[in-house]
Amino acid sequence: MIEKHIVLEDIDPVVFYGVSNGHLQMIKSLFPKLRIVARDNVIRILGDEEEKAKIEEDIETMRKHIVRYNTITEEDILDIVKGRKTKADAVKDVLVYSVAGRPIKGRSENQQQLIDAFDKHDMIFAVGPAGTGKTYLSIALAVKALKEKAAKKIILSRPAVEAGEKLGFLPGDMKDKIDPYLQPLYDALEDMIPAVKLQDMMDKHIIQIAPLAFMRGRTLSDAVVILDEAQNTTPAQIRMFLTRMGWNTKMIITGDLTQIDLPHAEKSGLKEALSILNHVEGISVINLDKKDIVRHKLVTRIVNAYEAHDKADKR
């Protein structure tokens, strides 16, 4: 009999084998005609040829499940081996699972529209107040595309202008000055990708995070590209960014038109782009509002209070 070797690629073997090898022992019990030996990320199988073909197919399904969701349960394994409906079929609305195992998916009608728009359009503008999940959901869509090999890399960017601070007046070298502006993007990625794997992807430039100015002169192909806080771009900056789009690339531009930190005389590039590109074929504009806020319930009350204050000021 020929021994079959299966390599667990793109996943943490510990997740596959389970706590105290619980998953592995379960798989062995489901295939009593086979001798199964696991070492690191390689599984060696000896025994009945038909059973070997079946387990190879099932292990690949389990591997893909872990790639997408970062986790797998004994119930999932049983469903896969027994040919019942898998978790992947049952929760198609889940984009990815967080490192902690929490499902990440659209939680409102407008968030679902953003997800649907990503499937149908190459460029999406997601506009709405703080807490509506526009950035987090966009990054989840990018991570999903990367895991499913629909994209080769993720590129995340922000304009380095916020809260009235000028980079030249901040202490430290350029990295020290820039990193605080990009931290929300790191936070979202760390929630979805294990730390060691994330660092490896960044070292290999599979995931890139950079200020908007670093995009100049580049053509961004085979990627999901996200521009966050786009309300703080100038018209020239956002025009430069949008024209970086290359083949097999999707762009998501997020922003909140109520939080523009540009000097008063400067026009928001996002505001101008929305008025110019609103009806261009291939571009989708998704407007999120306070009904989509998924942070602490106080955030909704704060947004409502400021909206009322702004309306009173205009009278």
Question: For the regions a protein language model found, what residue spans apply to each?
Answer:
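Flexible glycine-/small-residue-rich
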Residues: 8-10, 38, 47-49, 158, ...
